[in-house]
Amino acid sequence: MQNSTLIDSFGRQVTYVRLSVTDRCDFRCIYCMAEDMTFLPRKDVLSLEEFALLGRAFAELGVTKIRVSGGEPLIRKDVIQLFESLGAINSINDLCLTSNGSKLTELAKPLVDAGVHRINVSLDTLNEQRFKELTRFGDLNTVLKGIDAALNAGFKKIKLNSVVMKNYNLQEAADLATYALERGMDISFIEEMPLGEIHSHSRDVEFISSDELRNQLSNSFELTATNEHTGGPSRYWKARDYNAKIGFISPHSHNFCDTCNRVRVTASGRLLLCLGNEHSVDLRAILRAHPGEIEPIKEALINAMAIKPEKHEFNLEEEPQILRFMNMTGG
């Protein structure tokens, strides 16, 4: 595997980029965005061609993993064309998608055909009423049918992501894990990240650490720590009698900054060097000043490594320092 040209001032190589191709979503999950969310003007969102060019630029600089996220990426018109463009880049050996699952019934097979290797599906509850409460607009049965379609479509791997909140869905953690493991899917439980101002709940009240959750799950599963990583921040535990694993993403209790290998591009073309900092570079301005040219983009990406911070500064007890919502950042 080629070494990345993208090396920050702390010696970390960036080999993974997350592209948020839209800030729009057909859900309004309470931890992700406001119910009356104002979205970007469409002219401010990068075109699919601009995202494809960014993918090529990152690949030429040694990135080997691209994850497409949103908002909900699959509601973007003609997004399959972007996956086809990214899937055609030989040096990208891991093309992934994060989705809420609402469009997978019709798009799972086209995604596999376009070259997508792995997908993560967000699923925080198996209770229909609670699903409506958490997502505001979502339909649980549609998502479950989408997951079934994905399981039959031929992806190399399907993983579930669950954000756990103490008074919303903590009591379902074991059921969610069982649902995933019995179907051969890994599941990652995520500590809620303090991005954007929300009014539906208090993050510090709802917080449960990964260690607390793992101890609770140990009542239902015999868990053994593994050294397995998939290029992301999950720490995985093997559940006895299952081939799949349970992971924990712990930005508060066990941050993953020292091994950070990723950057993000927002729907509006901001290169975010850190999930929990506002350090960024305006790639849209460069893309539109030099349409179709890859070298100015590569130069900007290399130069941006100098401002990638050592770590994030998440603090549940303070007002959020990052005012952009998760749908703007790329979940």
Swiss-Prot record:
Record domain Radical SAM core: where: 9-233
Residues given in the record as [4Fe-4S] cluster 2 binding sites: C257, C260, C274
Catalytic function, reaction form: GTP + AH2 + S-adenosyl-L-methionine = (8S)-3',8-cyclo-7,8-dihydroguanosine 5'-triphosphate + 5'-deoxyadenosine + L-methionine + A + H(+)
GO molecular function: 4 iron, 4 sulfur cluster binding; cyclic pyranopterin monophosphate synthase activity; GTP 3',8'-cyclase activity; GTP binding; metal ion binding; S-adenosyl-L-methionine binding
Binding site for [4Fe-4S] cluster 1: C25, C29, C32
Xref: Gene3D superfamilies: Aldolase class I
Top EC class for this record: lyase
GO biological process: Mo-molybdopterin cofactor biosynthetic process
Record: residues binding S-adenosyl-L-methionine: Y31, G71, S122, M193
Record keywords: 4Fe-4S, GTP-binding, Iron, Iron-sulfur, Lyase, Metal-binding, Molybdenum cofactor biosynthesis, Nucleotide-binding, S-adenosyl-L-methionine
Signal peptide start-end: none
Cofactor note: Binds 2 [4Fe-4S] clusters. Binds 1 [4Fe-4S] cluster coordinated with 3 cysteines and an exchangeable S-adenosyl-L-methionine and 1 [4Fe-4S] cluster coordinated with 3 cysteines and the GTP-derived substrate.
Annotated binding of GTP, by residue: R18, R67, T98, K159, R262, V263, R264
Entry's EC annotation: 4.1.99.22
Family indicated by similarity: Belongs to the radical SAM superfamily. MoaA family.
Known partners and oligomeric status: Monomer and homodimer.
PANTHER family: MOLYBDENUM COFACTOR BIOSYNTHESIS PROTEIN 1, MOLYBDOPTERIN COFACTOR SYNTHESIS PROTEIN A
Protein name according to UniProt: GTP 3',8-cyclase
Source organism per UniProt: Saccharophagus degradans (strain 2-40 / ATCC 43961 / DSM 17024)
